From Swiss-Prot:
GO terms for biological process: photosynthesis. Pfam families: PsbI (PF02532). The chain crosses the membrane at residues 6-26. Belongs to the PsbI family. NCBIfam families: PRK02655.1. Its main location: plastid. HAMAP family: PSII_PsbI. It comes from Thalassiosira pseudonana. GO terms for cellular component: chloroplast thylakoid membrane; photosystem II reaction center. This is Photosystem II reaction center protein I.
Length: 38
């Protein structure tokens, strides 16, 4: 049961970090004129 919880937490952290990295890397290229987030 503990290994299942570790696997779930690892998957969630992986997808969250992948989403954050993809959002930060693609946001300036999609919106070059938007500087209000900085």
């Amino acid at each position: 049961m503990l290994t299942l919880k570790i696997l779930v937490y690892t998957t969630v952290i992986f997808f969250v970090s992948l989403f954050i990295f993809g959002f930060l890397s693609s946001d300036p290229s999609r919106n070059p004129n938007r500087r209000d987030l900085e």
